[in-house]
Amino acid sequence: QGRPLGPPIPP
């Protein structure tokens, strides 16, 4: 998909 894998970035 277009989104890279990895932990989500906190706001």
Swiss-Prot record:
Keyword Secreted on entry: yes
GO cellular component terms attached to this protein's record: extracellular region
Tissue expression as described in the entry: Expressed by the venom gland.
A molecular-function term among this protein's GO annotations: peptidase inhibitor activity
UniProt superkingdom: Eukaryota
Residues the record lists as Pyrrolidone carboxylic acid modifications: Q1
Compartment(s) where it occurs, according to its Swiss-Prot or TrEMBL record: Secreted
Task of the protein: This peptide both inhibits the activity of the angiotensin-converting enzyme (ACE) and enhances the action of bradykinin by inhibiting the peptidases that inactivate it. It acts as an indirect hypotensive agent.
Annotated family: Belongs to the bradykinin-potentiating peptide family.
The protein's name in its UniProt record: Bradykinin-potentiating peptide TmF
Source organism phylogeny: Eukaryota, Metazoa, Chordata, Craniata, Vertebrata
